[in-house]
């Protein structure tokens, strides 16, 4: 399906180095963005969407989601949570390990099998149109170099430290190194223990492990000591992920430290859900608003922290609005009845943005109304469609 989105007030690029893109029109074809500019021709498009003066941004990337199998979370006994996150503007979820699978295995063969099965289960399954990167191997004692080669051979590219049966968090270090040697993106639980049997992991542990990402560095949900945060900022180049289901005060502290260090590209926004804190379809939007309103982060930079920053660390071809990127686009606006007049001023005010349309893989999933955010001030609409679908989402 070839899709044109026109009449866009502002394009939020997702690129932290250039967060506003020039233009008012985005053209999508064959699941990719083919052009970003001004006054594009919609005549040869199957679908043309009038943004109605709303802003466009890349689909949000939630880089901390506890996937299991299917669109179901045993932790909160909830069906359909991933499809619901689409209505919060989230178009990509990245597994933080399948640790919530009931009775999950703990031996090397079992954790490999779990990661491979999850990876392959979501390879072609897109709940609500969402792209799910599942299959994050839980690092356990006994894994050897050949295991990581096998995992990589099956397409597993994520590894999680923090839930294994190690005597001390320092013991994760050689396992993280093995995973990195085989091309896996490595993440480590940071902060106090989150589930029975896990342990607290602080800055010294993380620095010894040298993962790609310090997961929920603000606490998941319990934070490490304040003195540890400057160490991670100043003694490493590890990406620092802040999560909605964590400590807000330390989220703001992380943002302050990274901004002062000129390292805002290292800050990643995620939710750490579903967990004991629940299911949060709008969690990404809330953390973006917290940073913009309380941490002096420019709202377009907060958008980049939830999109392009995640994409760069996780090596994804999404998270930015640019020709050649994956065609995941969200139309956003201030919510109806509020004090602000556009999406960016809403974030700066501490409000969430309203979601007016979501397109994933170049396919409109709904246009005009989100099931989960308040109504937008302006209304996106399908101006032209040559397919038997109006994408209105009126059933919401």
What role is predicted for each listed range?
Residues 1-43:
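N-terminal metal-binding scaffold of metallo-dependent hydrolase/deaminase domains
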Residues 156-278, 295:
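Active-site core of metal-dependent hydrolases
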Residues 81-110, 122-139, 153-166, 183-187, ...:
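Divalent metal-dependent hydrolysis catalytic cores, especially in the metallo-beta-lactamase
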Residues 256-334:
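His/Asp/Glu-enriched, well-ordered alpha-helical/loop segment
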Residues 8, 31, 53, 64, ...:
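Divalent metal-coordination and catalytic microenvironments
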Residues 42, 51-116:
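Metal-associated gating/positioning segment near the N- to mid-region
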Residues 74-82, 140-151, 196-205:
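Short, acidic/polar
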Residues 327-379:
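C-terminal cap of metal-dependent C-N hydrolases
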């Amino acid at each position: 399906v070839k899709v044109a989105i026109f009449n866009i007030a502002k394009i939020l690029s997702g690129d932290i180095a250039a967060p506003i893109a020039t233009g008012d029109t985005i053209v999508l074809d064959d699941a990719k963005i083919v052009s970003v500019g001004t006054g594009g021709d919609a005549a040869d498009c199957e679908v043309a969407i009038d943004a109605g003066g709303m802003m466009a941004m890349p689909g949000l990337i939630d880089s901390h989601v506890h996937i299991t199998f299917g669109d179901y979370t045993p932790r909160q006994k909830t069906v359909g949570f991933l499809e619901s996150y689409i209505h919060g503007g989230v178009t990509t979820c990245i597994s933080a390990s399948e640790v919530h699978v009931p009775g999950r295995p703990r031996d090397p063969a079992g954790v490999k099998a779990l990661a491979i099965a999850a990876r392959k289960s979501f390879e072609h399954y897109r709940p609500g149109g969402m792209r799910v990167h599942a299959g994050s191997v839980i690092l356990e004692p006994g894994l050897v170099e050949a295991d990581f080669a096998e995992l990589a051979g099956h397409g597993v590219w994520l590894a999680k430290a923090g839930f294994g049966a190690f005597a001390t968090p320092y013991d994760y270090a050689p396992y993280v190194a093995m995973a990195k040697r085989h091309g896996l993106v490595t993440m480590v639980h940071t902060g106090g223990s989150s589930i029975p049997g896990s342990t607290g992991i602080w800055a010294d542990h993380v620095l010894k492990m040298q993962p790609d990402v310090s997961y929920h560095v603000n606490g998941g949900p319990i934070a490490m000591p304040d003195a540890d945060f400057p160490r991670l900022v100043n003694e490493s180049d590890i990406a620092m992920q802040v999560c909605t289901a964590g400590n807000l005060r330390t989220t703001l502290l992380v943002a302050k430290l990274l901004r002062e260090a000129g390292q805002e590209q290292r800050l990643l926004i995620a939710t750490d859900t579903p967990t004991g804190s629940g299911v949060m379809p709008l969690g990404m939007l809330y953390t973006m608003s917290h940073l913009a309103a309380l941490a002096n982060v420019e709202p377009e930079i907060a958008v980049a922290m939830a999109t392009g920053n995640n994409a760069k660390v996780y090596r994804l071809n999404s998270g930015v609005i640019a020709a050649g990127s994956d065609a995941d686009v969200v139309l956003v606006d201030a919510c109806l009845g509020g004090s602000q007049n556009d999406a960016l001023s809403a974030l700066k005010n501490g409000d969430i943005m309203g979601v007016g349309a979501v397109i994933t893989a170049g396919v409109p999933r709904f246009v005009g109304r989100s099931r989960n955010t308040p109504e937008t001030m302006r209304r996106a609409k399908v101006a032209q469609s040559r397919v038997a679908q109006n994408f209105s989402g009126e059933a919401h």
